[in-house]
Amino acid sequence: MSQTQRDEYVRKLIEGELDYLFTVDMFNEGVDIPAVNQIVMLRSTESSIIFTQQLGRGLRKFPHKESVVVIDFIGNYNNNYLIPVALYGNTGDRDRARKNLQRKSIGLSSISFDPIAKERILKSLDTADWSDMKKLSEQYRQVRYELGRIPMLTDIYNYDPSLPYTIASKRSNYLDFVRSREKSLGKGKHHEATFEDQLEPVTDVEDAILKMAAELLLPGLRPHELVILAQLCHFVSERLDDDVPQHWSAGSPIGRSELLDAIRTEFPQSDGSDTQFDSAISVLDYSYFTGPNCNRFGNQPLVEAVNSTGTENGTAYRLNSRFADMLATNRTFRIFFADTLRTGMANCRDIFREAAARQQVFDHMFLYERKYSMADVMRLCGWKKENTPQNVGGYLLDKETNTMPIFVKYAASQYEDEFLSTQEMKYFSKNGRTPQSPEFRWALNGIGPNWGQTHFVPLFVMRKAEEAEGKYYYVGHVAAFDNPQLTTKPDASGQGSVKVTLSILRLARPIDPELYRHLVS
């Protein structure tokens, strides 16, 4: 079809000579028809970007036009999870997309889904592969094209705050992802100019440190490590394509009280206790990690304590000298580590800003309805030493912090943990435990109005449909263990039985009905 013919059909549509204009692979972008007030979608859309472009054909203001009606006849196709992704601008976080689906408006626009379409989209959200390399590569190329250079995580964050962690965790770290994409862009029949030559090689230890930063610092769940590193590193702004490399050197040691003040000042809602600070230091000096994780993250401390006569308690902290030397001598490593740190700080600020906007109060370091991995929970409980998931099992008591997180993989059956109501759960202990076992003696000690001051039992629940993700919803803390009784249940073989303690966990507050339905569905 010639441009003249196309313009003529558009004119007829605007002037009312045509009621509908059907297009295939046309009008996705670069077409401005403000008068359009109805969009009918008749085939599946495999890209959230194209979906948004198609939707945008009807979003321009026009005299006497009060709304646009979107009739979507293909809401049952496999990728229909892209509909809320396109509408609400989230492309990297399944749970945020689910929450967005509950929203009725975006700015001045209102959105509604019929119940069947909503149910199908929710099912699609459960099965969608959010880390599909093809989709992530498309998003990387989009930002790269707009910037004309290698996009850093801060650039990805500005494009879509939900994407940095998804992209960085697709490979060992974000530098590894970038290197793989730049190599890919330089190959194939549609090869493009590549910026691979801007990336210096990094050592195995440097790569492992970037991996640790991507896993622990980038999500921004706790500000302590981020603030401590920001204070000690004093990174300057620099880019891979800078003509003249920036000079960087490690700063002077900073006292413990000064670092604590910085955390409390920038994040007053956070837990500024010595327990959390010491836990963060143990992460940064690597004494927190188990042997396998320590090796996986490079076995290289980032900070170290030094004696200082000029500080209040004689303790100060500085960057580990070997780590500081890595930062000073390898520009690529320094830029990507600093970028991960900045993006983690941006994510952390978002978490605290969103909590304040929703008038949410942190329960110790946890936010209701947010998802956490088992590793996240151990760290945020303030433990000085992590444990293996096998040792944690369904729960683990840490007497030093008086915390005992409970983890439930929800699949209701006769011999499984099960919600009895929005505030109570039938809960089976580990095998072989009795009401006289240490964790139950601890839980039943000091029962009374002040029990919560000496006991913190956060409850985390994982949906069976989300098991591959490995994360649990925080549903609140347990206020009481009601009626613990010794009982039995079938063993793993199904041929015998094992002793367990059955008790009723009573939450401090009922679970929100929407989240409750989501968990038990």
Language-model features: where?
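Conserved helicase ATPase core of P-loop NTP-dependent helicases/translocases
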Residues: M1-N28
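Compact mixed alphabeta submodule
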Residues: E466-S521
